[in-house]
Every structure is written in structure tokens, then in C-alpha cells.
Amino acid sequence: MTIFSIINSTAILPTQILENATITIEDGVIIDIAENGPATERYVNAEGAICMPGIIDSHSDGFEMEPRPRPSVRLPLDFSIQSFEAKVRAAGVTTLFHGIGFENDGNRTVESANAYVNIIHEYSSSPTVMMNHRVLYRLDARDADGFNALCARIESDRQVDAKPLVSFEDHTPGQGQYRDRTYLENWIMGSRNMTREEAVAHVDQILIEREAVRHNKELALPWLTEQAALGNITLMAHDPATPEDVAEAVTWNASIAEFPTSVEAAQAARAAGLRTVCGAPNALRGSSHSGNVSATELISLGLCDGLSSDYLPFAMLGAVGTLVKNGTCTLPEAVRLVTYGPAETVGITDRGRLEVGLVADVVVCRFNRNLPSVLGVWRANGSPLQSLAMQGV
């Protein structure tokens, strides 16, 4: 039996802040939360720092990028997942869905997707694992190879992932994230050193190629729709831009609208009973990098159920600080957006709140104005581990 406590903390509970809180943990489960509660034999003094649930991230693309720090460099996947884990754990993330793209396009291949998923499952059962690793299966809506591989992968993974999270994504210019193709053209100009004319021609070519495989989207939908209806998958509609997009997603039996690009789409998602996920980097910056609706606006309108890191893990805690500083949220409300909100969205019921009986994934941190510093991270089903900062080294 392992029992310890975190004393003298500022505990962020679901609807309130509890000062001078003692949180007692036994065998990875919270067994008591009390103001000025007694310390156990083993304890950590938080010295007034914030104690909050571990962050739950429903969409992170970071692991896919970790093995490729330079265009000509390829790192081993077993090293890469531990390297990336260290980064996200230092950002206070304790449960993470790795976005793995099933498609044959550019740097993404079906072969690499399967290799990524293999190492995630393998490392998850390692005695050295330091967080809860899960998979977000991302399907390019128009890629037949990706669809066939994803179907086979999901069936083979049933024992380790009974109800996988699947995102159905169509990044064809002129819809979704790049409904205004000018933003994609600007991105191509900056990232590939093209002129405006070259970027326009490049996007034109993408449209021709994507239109040629449009039929693959219709071939994938019956299987996805059936699997979602049977409860075999949790289906995300990615980048819905209009109420019509949301209405279509409802016919797929999607339950999540991920990254709605307009207020109207988010309102339609709420009216249809879909959970809504926004990007933490968007909330941190106060605006979308591709000209779409601000996550802060959706949060202020009550149209966001949770944030995900997308491409920047530390943005989760950064968004908490920013949302509180600019008055969009109270601290408990902002914390909910990166903990219980995402948990509820993806169907995880045993964590995400500081409550007796729940999994003791816990983060101790401070905010200097709106800028976070993580002092300690604990995860359930493992020995209590904390950063050197918490040990006073």
C-alpha cells in the first residue's frame, strides 16, 4: 500500500478553490480532500501552490513530429516517445491522445502510422511509462489506403482500445480550416518560399488531386457511421465550418465537433448535442492562425467544452493562465477546460477532477501573472514522482 499527501495546497475543485488543502492519495486514488487536513507520514508541502487534476489532452500531433527534428534526421521511435513524454509531462499532461494520421501523403504513410501505434501500445505497458498514452486515429477522408489501414488497425486493437477515438478529416482547400484558401496560400508562401503565383498554382493542383479522389470519402462513411452507431468508436467531425457541416456530421453519428471554425458551426454543434473541442494555442494567442473563429470567443459564449493542445502541449496550461488573466473564465472554469471537460468529451469517467474516489493524476503549479510553472506531477498506478523543483533541489 502506498499512501501520501500533498499539504498546504491551493486545490482547484470543480466549482471552487480550497485554500490550505490537504489531498491524501492511496494506491493512486484520492481518498480525502480537506482544509488544513493532517499530513500522512509521507507528504509533499506545496507551499501554497495550485494543485489541480492532471491535464487530459484529446489531440496532440507532437509525437508524429518528434522523430523528425530536422528534414534529414530520423530518430528511433522508442527514443522519440520517451522524449516527447518528458516534454508533455513537464507541461502537466497526464493523459494524452496521440494524433496519428492514416494516409499516404507527404511525411505521413500508412506504414508509419502503424509503427507509431505499435510503439504507443508497447510503451504503454512498460514499467517506466510516466503518463497515460492513448491514440487518436486520424483518417484523411479521401485516402483509400488510409481508410483500409485504419479499419484493419481498429479491429486488431480491440483488446487494448475497446472504443477508439477517430477523427474524420477533410483538409481539401476551400472548406474546414482553410475555407478561405488564401490562408493556406500564405502558409505555403512562408513555409516553402514560394511566390504568390506559385502558391496559388500549388493550391489549384491540390484541388485537382483532391477532387479526383473525392469518391473515397463516400466509400468510408458507411463503415464509420455504422461503427459510431454501434458504439464501437467515438467519432469526431474535424473542422466543421458551417451548420450544414454539423448537420452532416450528425448523420455520421459523430458525437464531437473538433475545432469548429465559426460561431455558427459551434452553435449548431451545441444545439445538436455534440461536444465541442477548441485549440489551446488559439485560446493562448487569442486568435486562430488560419483566420477562423477565436477559441476565446467560443469559450465566452459557452460553446467550448474543452481544449486540446493540437501542436503545442504547454499551451494547455498557458491557456488556463491567459483565460483567467483576461477575465474570460474563473480559475476553476479554466482548469475544467483542460481536465474534466476533455475527459467528459472522450468518455473518460475516472479522472479529471479532484474528488474522492477518482484517479489521482495531480499537477502542482504556479502562475506568475498568466505564465505557468509546473512544480510537480503525479500519476496513478505508479510511484509518486515529482520534479526537482518540488524536492527543493
Protein language model annotation of sequence segments:
Residues 215-217, 237-239, 257-266, 285-292:
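A general structural motif
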Residues 1-39:
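N-terminal metal-binding scaffold of metallo-dependent hydrolase/deaminase domains
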Residues 54-58, 96-98, 133-137, 164-170, ...:
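Hydrophobic faces of well-ordered beta-strands that scaffold small-molecule active sites
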Residues 102-107, 111-240, 310:
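Metal-coordinating catalytic core of metallo-dependent amide/deamination hydrolases
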Residues 9, 27-30, 340, 356-393:
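C-terminal cap of metal-dependent C-N hydrolases
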Residues 230, 272-282, 286-365:
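His/Asp/Glu-enriched, well-ordered alpha-helical/loop segment
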Residues 46-118:
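Metal-associated gating/positioning segment near the N- to mid-region
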Residues 158-163, 249-256, 271-277, 302-305:
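Glycine-enriched alpha-helix->loop->beta-strand junction motifs that scaffold or abut catalytic
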